[in-house]
Amino acid sequence: MSVDQDVVDEAYQYYAEDKRQISDKARKFIEFIDPILRKYSKLFRYYQNFAKFTLEYYYKLFYPFLEKLPENVVEDLKRQIINEIMSNPNQSIRDVLAKAVQKEAQRIEEQLQRRPQRAKQQPQKTKTSEVANQRVSRSAENQGKRGNEEKQQQKTPGKTEEASGAEQESGEEGNQQEESGEEQEGVKGSRSKQREEQEEEVSESEGKQSEESGESESEEGQSSEETQLSSSGEGNQQEEGKGGEGEGAETEEGGRRGEAESEQEEGEETGNGQESSGEAQNGGESGESEGEITESESASEEQTGSKGKSGQQGEEGQQQSGSEGEEGAEQEESGEEGNQQEGVGKQKKRSSRGQESEAGEEPGSAPEETQLSSGEEEAGQESGGETGSEQGFGEEGEQGQESETTGKQKGKKREATESGGGAESESEEGQSPEETQEGGEGGAETEEGGQGSEAEGTAAEGEVGQPSEQGVSSSTGSGQRSEGSEASEEQNAGESGEGSESEGAESIAGEQTGSSSESAGSEQLGSQQGELSLEEGGRGYAHGDEDLLSSPQEINSILQTLSQLRDTVQQLRNYDFYSNAIDERTFDDQNVSEHRKEKEIENLYDTANNVQKLLKDLNVSEGEQNKILQELVTQYSLRRLLGNIATKYKGLLDFVRNKGESEVESRHGSGKGPSSTMGDDLSRLFIKEYAKLSNPIQQKMFLLDYLNGALSIHKSEEKKQGDFLFVIDSSGSMEGNKIATALAIPLVTYKKYKGKRNILVETFSDEPSPIYNIKNIANVLGSMKFGGTNIGSAVLYALKNIDKPDSDYDRKLRESLRKTRTLILLTDGEDEIPDDIAREINSLKKKNKVELLCYGIDLGERGLKTLKEICDEVYAVGSNNFGNIVLKRLVH
C-alpha cells in the first residue's frame, strides 16, 4: 500500500510551487519512506496523518541526500531503518534515523578498510594484466635462454670464478652455486641451475652488474631495492640478485664471496642443495618454485628474484661481482650476507610466503611490484640484466661498506641459519618486486655504482632489514595479507623457509621503498596497492562481501553524504531538553511530589516558547510560519493556555482523573467510558495530546493535527442550554399577520430542537395570560386577549414563575420553567415601564441567569428606548421579516 497522491499533494503544499514539477521527486521519496511509514505507523492511530507529517518533515531532510546516494546504498539504508524500527518500535524516529545512518556509514567504512586487502589479493586483474602477459612471453624466452645458459654454465662454471678475479671465490661460489643449483635442479629441478647459469652468463656479460645485482639481492634480503634489482633483471638481475645473494654469502664465508660461494654451496648442499646460503633457501625455493618461476618468470621473477632466481642471480651476481670487483662485490656481498643472515630467520619466516607466492601467491605478495618488477626484469633481461643490476646497485655502493659490516655480523648469524635453510638469500630474494623493477629500470645507470647500490641496499637492509622485514612483510610481504596474517605467515615462513623469503624481501623492499625510493617506496606501494587497485579495478558499490565503488572518491562521497545526513538528523538532538515530557502516569502517581508535577508542566510551557523553532523544522515558507504562529500563539493563546495549566494544573488533573483512564482509552477505540472526538478545542484536549509537545517528532504531529482539527478531545457532555419562554404581545395592534408570525416562531423553534428543549408561551395585553407549553397550542390560542399593552407586568410575571413556578402549574411545566434560560419578548407597542418594576426585572434576570431578548416590531425610537431599560438585546424589526430574524437568532 503506497501513499495516495492527495497525501503527497498535501504534504508538499507548503513549498511545491508546481506540483507537477515535484511529483517525480515526491514519488521517489515516497517509495523510500513508505515501507518505513507502514512499519512505524502501527504506533499511531492515523497512518495518513503520520504520512503527511513524515513526508512534510523529512522530505527536504532526506531527498537531497537520496539524490547523491546510489540506489543500492539507499536500499541498504532503508533496510537499516526498518531493522531499527522493528528492533525497538518505541524509540523515536529521530533516533531510528540517526542509528540507521550511523550503521550504514560504518558498514561502508568497514568494507572500505577491507578493500585494500582484496585489492592486493587480486591485483593482476586491475593493473598488471599486460605485465602478466608480457611475463608469460618473457618467461618462455627466459626459459629458452636459461636452457642455453645452463649449458653455458655447465661449460663455463670456472670462467665465472676467473672472471671474478679476486672474486674467484664468488666465481667459485657461482660455480658451486651452479653445481649446487644443478644439484638442486636434480633435487628440485633444473630450473635453478638454468637460472644460475643464466645469472653466471649475465654476470660475466654484465660483470659489475652481477656484482650490483648480487649486492642488491643481498640488500634485497634487507632492502627492497635489491629485490627490485634482482627482479627487474630476473633474466639477468634476478639471477644476479640470487647470485648476489649467493655472492653475499660467498663474500662473507670465503673472501666474502668465495666464502659465500662455499657457504652457498654448502647451503645448497646442506640447505636442500640451494645455490647459496641465501640461495640455499632461495635455491630450495627456486628448486621448488623454479618450475613455477620459469613458467611465469615475471611473477616468479619478483619472488623468484627472492627465490628460484636467487640461485641464478646468485651465480650471475657472483659472476658479475667477480667482473665488478672482488672488493666491492665482496663488501657488498658481505653486506648482503649480513643482510641475508639477518633475513635468514626472517626469510625462513617468509619462506612460507615465498612458497605461497611461488605457488602463485607471488601476485598476492606485492602484485603491483611483482608485475612491475617482472616487466622491468624482463625488460632488464632484454636490454641486458646488467643495466637493471647496475642501476639497482648504484645506490647501494655507497652504503656497501656499512652494510658489509652489518652484513658480515649478520652473515655470521646467517651462516648458522644457512645450514638450516639459507634463508639469507631468500630474504635478499624476498625483496619487493619494486626493488627488482627499480633495479631493472636503473640497471644501466648504476652499473658503475653497482657495488655502491648493493652496499646501499645492504645498508638499508642492515639498518632497515630487521624492522622492515617484520613490518614490511606484514604490510607488503603478501600484498594481500593483513599484518596479522603476514605475521602468521612469517611464522609459517620459518617452516616453508623459501617462499616467505621472497615475500619477506618484497615486504622489506616495501618498507624500504615506502618513501617512493627503492628503500622506502615499496612500503607505501605495498600499502597503497589496495587503494590503487581500488581506484582502477573496483566495479562499484555492492552489498555484502562484494567490492565497493570503483574509486575511493565515490566511496568518500557516499560516506560524506551519509555523514551529512547523520549530522542533520543528530541536530534534532537539540530538542532533548523536551525529554522531561508531561507524563500522565506521573500525575496519576500519588507518590510523585507536587513540585515535580509543577516542574513538568512548566516544561510544557517552555515548549510553547519554541513553537517557531518547530515550525522552521517543517520547512514551510516564512509567510506560512508567521500565519501558523499567529494562529497558535495569538489567536488561540496556546502560550497563555499552557501558562494557565502551569498555575492551575490541579483542576485539570482532577478533571482528567474524574473522566477516568477509560476516557483515554476511548480515543483508541476501546469504547469504554465517555467517548472522545476529533477537533481543535484546546480546552477539551486530552493530556496525552499535550505530551506530544515533548517530542520533536510528535510536536509536528500536534501542529498538523491541530491545523486539521484532528486532535483527540473530550466529547462535550450534551448540556441543555435551557428552555425558551416566548412572551407574545396579543394587543389589538398585533392582530392579523403579526400575531400569526409571532405564534409561528415558537412552533418552528420546537420543531428545530425536536423536543430537546421545551418551548413555553405566554401571551399578554393588559394582563398576562397563563403559561403553556407550545404543544398545547389550543390553550395558547384560547388564552389570547386583544386589548392594551402592559410590557412590564408581563415580563415580571414570567420571571417570577421562572424563579418560583406557580403551584397551579403541573410538575412538568414547573420543571421546564426552572430550566428556562432565554426569555423572548415580541411586541409592537410602546409602554412606560416604572422604575421599580424595571429594577425587579433586572434583579430576577441576574438571579436566575436568564437572558432577555426583545424584538420591537415597527417600533420607533421611544419604544426601543423603553425596551433597553430591561432587555439584554434589543432588535428593531419590521412586520414583514421579523420571523426570519428571530428564528435565525434562536436556531442558528
From Swiss-Prot:
Ranges where the VWFA domain occurs: 723-892
Stretches with biased composition (Basic and acidic residues): 143-162, 185-196, 536-546
Keywords: Coiled coil
Region: Disordered, residue numbers: 109-548
Domain of life, per lineage: Viruses
Classification via PROSITE patterns: VWFA (PS50234)
Protein's name according to its UniProt entry: Putative VWFA domain-containing protein ORF892
Entries under InterPro entries matching the protein: VWF_A (IPR002035), vWFA_dom_sf (IPR036465)
A Pfam family that the UniProt record links to this protein: VWA
Start-end of Polar residues biased regions: 129-142, 467-481, 512-531
Family annotation (Gene3D superfamilies): von Willebrand factor, type A domain
Acidic residues: compositionally biased ranges: 169-184, 212-223, 287-300, 324-336, 425-448
